[in-house]
Swiss-Prot record:
UniProt feature, compositional bias: Basic residues: 378-388, 647-660
PANTHER family: CDNA SEQUENCE BC034090, PAR-6-RELATED
GO terms of biological process kind: centrosome cycle; establishment or maintenance of cell polarity; regulation of cellular localization
Organism of derivation: Homo sapiens (Human)
Entry protein name: Uncharacterized protein KIAA1614
Gene name as annotated: KIAA1614
Length: 1190
């Protein structure tokens, strides 16, 4: 045996440890480093051949190690990582299963740098770790079925003593269990800690002898690498002695029923600190009985090896919780050299190795814990690594997106793989699991995609895109800057680039004219007036500076601006190729700038509309803002309009239905208009003309763009001597130079005149406009035909323009949501008309057609609608822009537009006086009116029919005036009055009817149109803050003050239910209250005629839809009390005033449905609220109560 063992005990892997003793000693301690099993070794059921367990630091040899003073051997947990052990165990298991090695199979050598190889001989084999990794501290004890000592001894093979080289050790009686190493009795229940092998007391041979278990101490005494003594416990079944580390097996264990003939795992002492209970051992044995004998033997061997290895390899750790017999629970880790470790199979993994002990949760040995930790770490790493990778990727992408260098698409693109991770990780960092863990560092959407509470995803996306485009523009701006245009770093810069000509005009007509000189066709003599409007009233950005900058730049950037703006205009006028060419770059620039400009420039009513659009859609809002800004900017800044068409072309989304058609149909023209900033003026003028026909409000818009007439001139020059056709035009042309309104009027006139100058071209354009208008075009045609003379020609161009204006206007009506759309449409229409008049005119008609078809409002309809809409539009604009911007735009950009805004109540009329003032440029005044009408059309008011009638009459009168010869002037006027026109009364009525229907539809579905017609983004209109009640209220502060004393209905509107609905914030309540107050004024005071002031609020209120509170108020005649305070909990403190007559009943309803929640508490005379409390007693009520006071 010894020889066999010696052979088997070759140092594993050249283990430095050699056999400590050359020969076995007759010591009671068996001197075999390997466990010898008496009799043939049963093969494991699983087919794993018994594995020799190497002593960690010693090669186990058959020769007995020099007898070491017996020492308590402890199992040191020094296992490889759990994963490694599992892998090895699995491999081993597979190998064993395949080999099906018999117990007596040739000894298998396990080489371990630390562990000596042990071969199993026929006589015996070294115990090998079982497939399942065993707990380092667990010791396998053969199950002895509680045999008496004698029986136990007898059960041991007689050969045992011989092989052991010593007589079998007598076993102490079961009652007097002893540590095998100490020989101290170990009561079954007694808990004992195995002393660290280093410090463990050495067991005397006697103690070993006393123990039936033969132990071999193959290690150096106290040497951490030394293997603990192995105790051979005879197995009743196998007749072999199973080696166990000293102190592992106790008589109690052997005696214990749990120790049956089958081999069981004796819990190995995990660390010196581990505590064992005999009961645990017994339980373990009992549990092990479930396992097959071979499995148990294998496990026992493994445990012994493990223990020996551990004890030899690593010092025990004290205080480690003792390993519990539960094999499943314990995931024993074997030493790296351990075969089981190599196999990596843990006892847990072994299907048969299930909880052997009664205790399901064994105290894990330090080694087991370590393995568990390692495993967990490995898992975490596995999770973390990918996550880290994703995380790294994400930051890059996110950063790029933030920087805007990455397109929003790029983020999704780069992120996709990571995005899921990011979303999983970012959204659910740790919850997402392994993958999410790595992704969690990453953020979901990049900041560029961050959405504001009031913006939709689409808006956020647009905003992000705009940002990206802005970056691109910056690149372009760098180029432009090289050209002295300056970078497009700001709206003004973009405006300069986009509407460089208008800016130049604004900056200095001389400069612009010089630019125009090179771009005569553009015919964009920059009107100084627009220059004066350098600052966007909406955004406050100085358009003046940009324009002057452009004015400065024009000479140098004139190359770029001319190429882009000028060439855009020229080529747009001359051909669409250039505009299209510019459009790719400029649309981005324009769109971005326009949006921003609209945000800034949309001071004009168009801007208000733009604001509405903005309200509707952050993105579309911008686009709309761009449109509005374009119109307004066109009004306010010629460049804006020019840009607006581009924006429309490029930003069809915001302009959507209208601009998509117009811009697409007139894309070249839009490009032209955009490219040639004067074209923007032209657009404005055309818008004026369009609105002049449809409503010449845009003429008013054009008022601010004096350069427009020069643009028109240039356009007309390109189209032909169109300026000449109208006396108004000639005069207006100076007016454009002198005053925008005259210029625009002149332009509008010029547009009509253009047909004259352009002759068939203009008429053809007009015809196209009519075609586009279809419905409107008949009126337009009629109007045009009504004035076959020069005015008639002017009318035709006007009709062309008007259809365009109408077309844009109806889209606003359609879009009702945003006057910007109307403005855009008007601008687009005017530009189209201008372009139509010009070579680009042909494309314009299609655009008009699209626009007109979209609107399909007759000029007269459009006109009346516009004035009518003007009011609602003003209200809407007021809601969005509070009507302040439009007015501002009005002044700076165009009296007509601003007047139109001012005209909200008497919209058409107010603009008309300025228009009349502009009548010097007749069309201008008319255009102003038309512009207002156009805006009104956008905002379709409730008083459509009346205004339509007025518009019709005015249109007829104006048309007549236009026919009289001032053509442009009269036409503008007529357009302002009739929109399309007076030219053809029948057409005008038809248009009016259509317009009424459109207006009514717009009015009725104003909000819906805003949300629905407003492109998908537009629906945000309601959401936009510009539409917030507070903003709406500011417009009618007077009404609010009047209705400030809340009537019962007023209180009701502010009722807690409503408050809760709104989120009970005092500010919100005030806003609501104010709006309610407005409603109250509408109901109570609505009759009283603040129509100018109340008109908007009243219309606004209807738009808002009456609330039950409004309708349900029992009486509007008297205010019952006031809302004193709103509390965070949603309750309101009301101050009720008893009517002088005596008792009164009132119900304070709460939305939460808790009638008893309120508590009336009479308070001392409340701080008088405007005398509410002075009337009789004041009651302070909590709004959740239903109270009747008598």
């Amino acid at each position: 045996m010894e020889g066999t063992e010696a052979a088997a005990a070759k140092p594993a892997g050249g283990s430095p440890q050699g056999p400590k003793t050359g020969s076995g000693t007759a010591s009671p301690v068996e001197g075999t480093s390997a466990v010898e099993w008496s009799g043939p070794e049963p093969q494991l059921d699983n087919g794993h051949p018994p594995r020799p367990w190497p002593c960690p630091q010693e090669n186990r040899t058959s020769s007995l190690m020099a007898p070491q003073p017996p020492r308590v051997w402890g199992v040191q947990l020094q296992g490889p990582s759990v994963l490694e052990s599992k892998v090895r165990a699995l491999k081993e298991k597979m190998t064993v299963a395949k080999q099906g090695v018999s117990p007596c199979s040739a000894s298998q050598e396990w080489s371990s740098p630390k562990k000596p190889q042990c071969r199993r001989g026929k006589a015996g084999r070294a115990g090998t770790p079982s497939e399942g990794s065993f707990l380092p501290g667990a010791v396998v004890a053969p199950r002895t079925q509680n045999l008496p000592d004698g029986q136990l001894d007898g059960s041991i093979n007689e050969e045992q003593p011989a092989r052991d080289g010593g007589p079998r050790l007598p076993r102490p009686p079961a009652p007097g269990r002893e540590y095998c190493n100490r020989g101290s009795p170990w009561p079954p229940e007694a808990e004992w800690t195995l002393p660290d092998h280093d410090r463990g007391p050495l067991l005397g041979p006697s103690s070993l002898q006393q123990s039936p278990i033969h132990g071999v101490t193959p290690g150096r005494p106290g040497g951490p690498g030394h293997c603990n003594k192995i105790i051979h416990i005879p197995s009743p079944r196998t007749g072999r002695s199973y080696p166990f580390p000293d102190g592992v097996v106790t008589e109690a264990d052997l005696d214990s029923t749990s120790l049956t003939s089958e081999e069981v795992f004796v819990p190995r002492t995990a660390l010196l600190g581990e505590r064992w209970r005999a009961g645990d051992l017994e339980a373990l044995g009992a549990g092990s009985s479930v396992l097959s004998l071979s499995d148990r033997v294998e496990r026992n061997r493994l445990l012994l090896q493990e223990m020996l290895n551990v004890s030899g390899q690593s010092p025990r750790k004290v205080g480690t919780p003792a390993w519990t017999p539960s094999w499943d629970t314990a995931a024993p880790e074997r030493p790296v050299g351990d075969v089981d470790w190599a196999s990596g199979t843990s006892l847990q993994d072994s299907g048969q190795n299930r909880t052997v002990g009664p205790n399901p949760e064994p105290v894990l040995s330090p080694r087991h814990e370590e393995a568990t930790h390692l495993l967990q770490r490995a898992r975490m790493k596995a999770r973390t690594r990918p996550l880290r990778a994703s995380h790294d990727i994400v930051p890059t992408i996110t950063q790029g997106s933030r920087d805007g260098h990455r397109s929003p698409a790029r983020d999704p693109r780069t992120t996709p793989a990571c995005r899921d991770s990011l979303q999983n990780g970012h959204t659910s960092d740790s919850s997402s699991g392994e993958s999410s863990g790595g992704h969690r560092p990453r953020r979901g959407p990049s900041p560029s995609h961050v959405r504001f509470e009031d913006e939709s995803a689409r808006e956020a996306e647009f905003r992000h895109l705009e940002r990206l485009q802005q970056r691109q523009r910056q690149v372009l701006s760098t180029v432009l800057q090289a050209a002295d245009q300056g970078p497009l770093r700001s709206k003004p810069d973009l405006a300069d680039y986009i509407n460089g000509a208008p800016r130049l005009r604004d900056a200095g007509q001389g400069t612009f004219h010089r630019l125009v000189g090179s771009l005569d066709r553009r015919g964009h003599p920059a009107p100084p007036a627009p220059g004066s409007e350098r600052r966007c009233q909406a955004c406050g950005s100085c358009i003046d500076d940009p324009r002057p900058a452009q004015g400065k730049a024009p000479p140098v950037p004139r190359t770029l601006q001319e190429l882009q703006a000028a060439c855009g205009m020229e080529r747009v006028l001359g051909g669409l190729s250039s505009p299209l060419r510019l459009l790719p770059a400029e649309p981005r620039l324009h769109m971005e700038w326009i949006r921003e400009t609209h945000i800034g420039d949309t001071v004009c009513p168009a801007e208000v509309d733009s604001a509405l659009d903005s309200t509707d859609n952050s993105d579309n809002c911008r686009t709309d803002s761009e449109e509005a800004g374009t119109s307004q900017a066109g009004w306010a800044c010629g460049r804006t309009q020019g840009s607006s068409p581009r924006l429309r072309l490029r930003g069809s989304r915001p302009r959507g239905h209208r601009w998509s058609k117009k811009a697409e149909a007139e894309l070249p023209w839009g490009l032209q208009a955009q490219q040639h900033l004067p074209r923007a003026d032209d657009v404005e003028v055309e818008n004026e003309v369009k609105e002049g026909r449809g409503h010449t409000p845009e003429g008013t818009l054009f008022l601010r763009e004096d350069a427009k007439p020069p643009d028109l001139e240039l356009k007309r020059v390109s189209l032909g001597p169109q300026w000449q056709p109208g006396p108004g035009l000639g005069s207006h042309q100076p007016h454009p130079l002198d005053s925008r309104t005259p210029c625009r009027t002149a332009y509008a006139t010029t547009a009509p005149m253009t047909p004259e100058s352009s002759g068939p071209g203009g008429q053809a354009q007009v015809t196209e406009s009519h075609e586009s208008l279809e419905i409107v075009s008949p009126s337009s045609l009629q109007q045009s035909h009504a004035e076959p003379s020069a005015p008639h020609q002017a009318w035709q161009p006007t009709a062309s323009l008007c259809p365009e204006g109408w077309a844009p206007t109806p889209p606003p009506s359609r879009k009702t949501t945003s006057p910007v759309s109307h403005r855009k449409a008007a601008l687009a229409g005017l530009l189209r008309l201008g372009d139509q008049t010009e070579p680009v005119g042909i494309p314009r008609p299609p655009s008009r057609s699209a626009v007109l078809r979209t609107c399909e409002l007759p000029p007269s309809q459009t006109q009346p609608s516009r004035p009518q809409v003007r009011h609602p539009l003003l209200a809407l604009s007021t809601n969005n822009c509070n009507n302040s911007a439009p007015r501002g735009l009005q002044e700076p950009y165009g009296g007509a537009v601003h007047e139109g805004r001012v005209e909200r109540g008497p919209c058409s009329r107010e603009p008309e006086p300025p228009l009349e003032n502009s009548r010097d440029g007749g069309p201008q005044g008319f255009l102003g009116s038309a512009d207002v009408a156009t805006i009104n059309s956008t905002g379709i008011t409730l008083s459509l029919s009346s205004e339509e009638s007025e518009s019709s009459k005015e249109s007829e009168g104006s048309l007549q005036r236009t026919g009289s010869g001032s053509g442009g002037h009269v036409l503008s006027r007529a357009s302002a009055g009739a929109g399309t026109g007076p030219g053809s009364p029948s057409a005008a009525p038809l248009d009016q009817n259509k317009k009424r229907s459109s207006s009514i539809a717009s009015t009725l579905g104003l909000k819906k149109l805003f949300s629905a017609l407003g492109q998908s983004s537009r629906p945000k209109l309601g959401k936009s803050r510009s539409y917030s009640v507070e903003q709406l209220q500011p417009a009618p502060p007077g009404l609010t003050s009047q209705s400030r004393a809340p009537s019962l209905q007023s209180l009701h509107p502010v009722s807690p239910s409503h408050q809760r609905r709104k989120a009970a914030s005092f500010q919100n309540l005030h806003s609501l209250l104010s709006s309610k107050g407005n409603r109250s004024s509408l109901y109570l005071v609505a009759g009283p005629g603040d129509h100018s002031a109340a008109g908007r609020p009243a219309k606004t209120s209807p738009r808002r839809a009456l609330s039950v509170e409004d309708v349900g108020a029992p009486s509007l005649a008297r205010t019952v009390g006031r809302l004193v305070e709103v509390f965070p909990d949603g309750t309101s403190q009301l101050q009720l005033q008893r009517s002088p007559g005596g008792t009164f009943g009132f119900c304070v309803a709460s939305g939460n449905g808790r009638p008893d929640s309120g508590m009336p508490s009479p308070l001392p005379q409340p701080h008088g609220w405007g005398g509410l409390s002075k009337q009789g007693r004041a009651f302070w009520l909590w709004s959740e109560a239903f109270l009747v006071f008598g």
